[in-house]
Amino acid sequence: MYAYFRGRVVSVLPEEAVLEVSGIAYRFLISTGTSRSLPQAGNEAILYTHLSVREDALQLYGFSSEEEKQLFRLLLLVSGVGPKLALAVLSGLPVAEVHEAILANAPERLFGVTGVGRKTAARIILELRDRILKLSPPGAAATPAGAVQCGIREDATNALLTLGFSRTAAQQAVAGVLEANPGGSVEDVVKSALLAMHNR
């Protein structure tokens, strides 16, 4: 129903944020990663959104990137995983590490997440591996490398957002850097992206 909300940050806590959009304050449940990526109160931000509809309540979930929202929705497809546990997974591990654990068939990497036991970790991998493979870039689908680069792209973009750049400008700059140097670290990508935007 909603793709994203753009508005003024009212408050940010480790597990929730309030965004004011056109005079209306919306409360979102968020991961700790999204919490860290949001600017201070008073600044503008974008939260990619998932609306959970239940008989007794409507709840908005907010994400710092489309990748995080996409993984959240995939986790909801796993039997026995609801919004609370899906958000716990995203709070416990970066998106790229979850992708890597699934692609590498390594359930032990998910055990450290609160609420995820051996059976749940095994189900996540069993039920999502094929879906994650389809999401990986061509030529990288069979290895964790594609997921790692996805995480680098996400982290570098979020770093540029915290510096005040628009999401469009940040994404374009990061994409250009990764195309020229796919093996760069997050720090290298951010530095190169800043240089590229400065020279425009």
From Swiss-Prot:
Subcellular locations according to the entry: Cytoplasm
Stretches the record annotates as Domain II: 65-143
Keyword DNA repair: yes
Positions of the UniProt region annotated as Domain I: 1-64
Cellular compartments per GO CC: cytoplasm; Holliday junction helicase complex; Holliday junction resolvase complex
Region (Flexible linker): 144-154
GO MF, one annotated term: four-way junction DNA binding
Residues making up the signal peptide according to the UniProt record: none
Keyword Protein biosynthesis (UniProt): no
Domain III: annotated segments: 154-200
Organism superkingdom: Bacteria
CDD domains: UBA_RuvA_C
Subunit structure: Homotetramer. Forms an RuvA(8)-RuvB(12)-Holliday junction (HJ) complex. HJ DNA is sandwiched between 2 RuvA tetramers; dsDNA enters through RuvA and exits via RuvB. An RuvB hexamer assembles on each DNA strand where it exits the tetramer. Each RuvB hexamer is contacted by two RuvA subunits (via domain III) on 2 adjacent RuvB subunits; this complex drives branch migration. In the full resolvosome a probable DNA-RuvA(4)-RuvB(12)-RuvC(2) complex forms which resolves the HJ.
Similarity-based family: Belongs to the RuvA family.
Biological role: The RuvA-RuvB-RuvC complex processes Holliday junction (HJ) DNA during genetic recombination and DNA repair, while the RuvA-RuvB complex plays an important role in the rescue of blocked DNA replication forks via replication fork reversal (RFR). RuvA specifically binds to HJ cruciform DNA, conferring on it an open structure. The RuvB hexamer acts as an ATP-dependent pump, pulling dsDNA into and through the RuvAB complex. HJ branch migration allows RuvC to scan DNA until it finds its consensus sequence, where it cleaves and resolves the cruciform DNA.
Domain commentary: Has three domains with a flexible linker between the domains II and III and assumes an 'L' shape. Domain III is highly mobile and contacts RuvB.
Protein name, entry field: Holliday junction branch migration complex subunit RuvA
Protein's gene: ruvA
